[in-house]
Amino acid sequence: PSSAASDVYKRQLLISVDSPERGIELYASELYKADRAYREYVTAWRRAHPEARSVDTDLQESYRSYQHALGQAWQMQVDKLERWSFKGVDAQSDFYEREISPVVGAKKKIAVIVSDALRYEAAQELAERINRENRFSTDLKKQYGVLPSYTQLGMAALLPHDPSSAHDSLAFGKDHYGVLVDGRSATGTENRDAILGDVGGKAIQAGELLKMKSIDVKALYRSCNVLYVYHNVIDAHGDSDKTEDEVFDSCETTFRELTDVVKKLAGGNVNNMIITSDHGFLYQGFDLDDSEWLSTQPQGDEVWVKKRRFTIGSRLAPDRAFITFTAAQAGLDDPDGEGVTIQIPNSIMRLRKQGTGSHYVHGGSALPEIVVPVLHVSK
């Protein structure tokens, strides 16, 4: 749009997004549609012009100004937060307690399918596709994700942990990147299976499940109260700079594979399922302007982890270019008193660093990164 049109747009967003809770509400009810329309357009364009490196410039520009307008409006609300928490909005870190405990407590069973980086707008389309199967009904809800919005922390947040303990039960491990749930590593299927074992649960990879005969799926489901099925296609492509621009094609693959997982589970007598994810993502199929890169770098006692959209360190110095949260403000534990701090570049800004792509990113606090789907599927 012309700059006049985009100014009107920006004002409209600033007026509408008038509280942190309202921002999440608005994204989940309306604003996600812009991200979906962009994904559908880019997918269609690339099919029609396989040789073209970049997508139609006008579209890119209008999507860029939309992302910036929303990013700024949302940032104004995030800046007001004392801690990473939203009144009356379900939290990803309460997922097990809220969605699974009551089911298991009532002596019923449930399966949870966790698809890495299945963002909210994609889950909306997935729900429509599952509904077309005519054997299932779906109900899509939202929850706000953990911060930083990256795989290890999001995956850990979805597991059973003790929300009533005096300390927050999620903490970074020794490498300050892997995550501990009540002191145990939550990295990888094996460790997650062990944590789920405490509540009579099991974990399996989607690829493994899809190869099973239905009699074996029945036996597996009979043997546990809750079954977690892990799926990773979107993030596997998005996180590599060689394949990040295939991320929308991976959404298509994901819709097909998750529909197959749902059918496979249903054939194994699973009537009750939830599809969710660890985090969402931001994607733009064009190179970033200089203005979209932060000129600042994080400073502090120590910088342990630096990614495009977040930094984890010790006593990081507050800076206007970032939002800065202590572990406690982010709902995390700091068991060794290391002054754990996280910093997130404002709006949709990226940090400069060597390697890794910049079109597909996550880890920050932007709405497409942190509004996480909770899709109930019943047979």
Residue ranges and their predicted role:
Residues D18-E82:
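Low-complexity, highly charged intrinsically disordered N-terminal segments
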Residues P1-A5, Y9:
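Single conserved hydrophobic/aromatic residue that forms the stacking wall/gate
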Residues D239-M273:
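A long, amphipathic alpha-helix that forms part
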Residues D216-V233:
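Active-site regions of oxyanion-processing enzymes, predominantly non-cytosolic
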Residues F86-A106, Y120-S214, Q329-V340, R350, ...:
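Active-site nucleophile/metal-coordination loop of metallo-enzymes that catalyze phosphate/sulfate
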Residues L126-E133, K242-F248, Y283-D301:
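Short secondary-structure boundary/capping segments
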Residues K107-L126, L227-Y230, L265, N271-Y283, ...:
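Beta-strand elements within well-structured catalytic alpha/beta cores of enzymes
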Residues D139, V233-I234, D290-S291, T296-K379:
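Active-site neighborhoods of enzymes that stabilize oxyanions during catalysis
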